[in-house]
């Protein structure tokens, strides 16, 4: 990331928003195509990764879309591990766990060696440890989970009949526009949860600090669907306290590294 990435980002997005023309979407927000310069630059990041994707950036009620597959903005995909944000909110709000509780590793082999240890919810969020959040979902239970997902109006709100994998394989699906709006609401404490609960989860999402600005985000990788889908959803909190939500969505193809989502997002925020 360049030295002035976040300050430059905040200025450039203001310029692009003032110069763009609106198009119709399923969102109630005003949706805009970015300036030609930004569109070409960010499109090239997806092209270079040999994948198709979009990143949506929100300021106020204005949404700007960038990438080489803009139609993805309103298409539904499994949320994969981005659902950990809501999973944690629901679990903490309903006293199914605490931020200090240690989730014990059961000794079984996991997808990644880094998951093979005891973890708190915050540590599991940082490592995107699926088994920990599957256990949290089982504690919540199918009935309460469905009630809460509908109450928040997350995506298509359909969690099906199995409580511990609906965000990985479906039937729960969500659009990038809905994801960025969810991030916006969490960033500004507008979700229907206690302020304390939202603040606890937000602390788990801090992934980078640059020049006084912070990036809060959660990645997702839908490996069990075809084609595979990748996410990075969150917000930039500038030094002055202003928050700018974003959601990156792309197709994860063979040969794509785990870091491609962060790399494209960071470059797009320059």
Q: What are the residue ranges of the model-derived segments?
A:
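Beta-lactamase-like hydrolase cores
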Residues: 23-75
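Active-site SXXK
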Residues: 76-101, 124, 246
